[in-house]
């Protein structure tokens, strides 16, 4: 399990996260919801090990405990951490004309037998990851020529390749996938396809997934658990049906909604009141 316990994060004198506790369970998808600036990306970066205890040069101070499979996250060295968790950050336009294949193969570098060397097995995994991400038609393309949605699918394939299961991965214990707005650049169809894939690999590979999602309806449709972040802490946490209520939405977003049942057994859909 990937766990934050009594986490506080502040930048100089501004508190971002306050006494926050949250666990990401293997085999389940947790969607993180909250307003812009609520601290969602900060929480994800802390889970990723990008923000560690003490005071960083940029003035960010982190206190509290983060553990991965019971081990303090700060004690896990970078090579081993890269085999235990993968991070998909918010989309950024690439500066160099790498090929799609090269970008996805980056996900295999933590597993290379020697520095910078990838094997036929790694290339096979990269191809399978592209297929799983619905990006196999983009093989050979220059990533600087891709649309935002195409690039998002390629980067998703990269993190799938990084966590692709093998005997060593199984022996290392549960692994984790951290996604920062993975659907932001995607059209409606690809949003649902990506999150369907996320939920499928979470179950098949026993991945713990934390995904920042801006659309509460999308999160409710595809997540096992929803965590709502407001005022620097988790204000609601549980199943989509339990968490997606007008009261919780108002507390999290300051916006009045009503819930409409879809009739297909899925959680209700949120619409403006």
UniProtKB/Swiss-Prot annotation:
Its main location: membrane. It is found in: Cell inner membrane. InterPro entries: AAA+_ATPase (IPR003593), ABC_transporter-like_ATP-bd (IPR003439), ABC_transporter-like_CS (IPR017871), P-loop_NTPase (IPR027417). GO terms for cellular component: plasma membrane. It is an enzyme of class 7 (translocase). It holds the Pfam family ABC_tran. Belongs to the ABC transporter superfamily. Heme (hemin) importer (TC 3.A.1.14.5) family. Part of the ABC transporter complex HmuTUV involved in hemin import. Responsible for energy coupling to the transport system. GO terms for molecular function: ATP binding; ATP hydrolysis activity. This is Hemin import ATP-binding protein HmuV. It is a peripheral membrane protein. Its EC number is 7.6.2.-. The keyword ATP-binding applies. SMART domains: AAA (SM00382). The complex is composed of two ATP-binding proteins (HmuV), two transmembrane proteins (HmuU) and a solute-binding protein (HmuT). Keywords: ATP-binding, Cell inner membrane, Cell membrane, Membrane, Nucleotide-binding, Translocase, Transport. ATP binds at residues 34-41. Residues 2-256 form the ABC transporter domain.
């Amino acid at each position: 399990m990937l766990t934050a316990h009594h986490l506080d994060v502040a930048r100089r004198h501004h508190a971002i996260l306050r006494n926050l506790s949250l666990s990401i369970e293997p085999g389940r998808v947790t969607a993180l919801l909250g307003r812009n600036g609520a601290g969602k990306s900060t929480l994800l970066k802390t889970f990723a090990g990008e923000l560690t205890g003490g005071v960083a040069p940029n003035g960010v101070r982190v206190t509290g405990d983060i553990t991965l499979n019971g081990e303090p996250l700060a004690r896990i060295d970078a090579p081993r951490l890269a085999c235990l968790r993968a991070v998909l950050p918010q989309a950024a336009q690439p500066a160099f004309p790498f090929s799609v294949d090269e970008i996805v193969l980056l996900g295999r570098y933590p597993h290379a037998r020697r520095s910078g060397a990838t094997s036929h097995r790694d290339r096979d995994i990269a191809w399978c990851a592209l297929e799983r991400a619905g990006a196999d038609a983009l093989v050979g393309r220059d990533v600087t020529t891709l649309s935002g949605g195409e690039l998002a699918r390629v980067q998703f394939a990269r993190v799938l390749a990084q966590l692709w299961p093998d005997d060593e991965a199984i022996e290392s214990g549960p692994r984790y996938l951290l996604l920062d707005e993975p659907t932001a650049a995607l059209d409606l169809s690809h949003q649902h396809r990506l999150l369907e894939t996320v939920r499928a690999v979470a179950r098949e590979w026993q991945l713990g997934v934390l995904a920042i999602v801006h659309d509460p309806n999308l999160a409710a449709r595809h997540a096992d658990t929803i965590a709502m972040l407001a005022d620097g802490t988790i204000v609601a946490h549980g199943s989509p049906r339990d968490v997606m209520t007008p009261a919780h939405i108002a507390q999290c977003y300051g916006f009045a909604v009503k819930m409409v049942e879809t009739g297909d057994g899925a959680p209700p859909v949120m619409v403006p009141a």
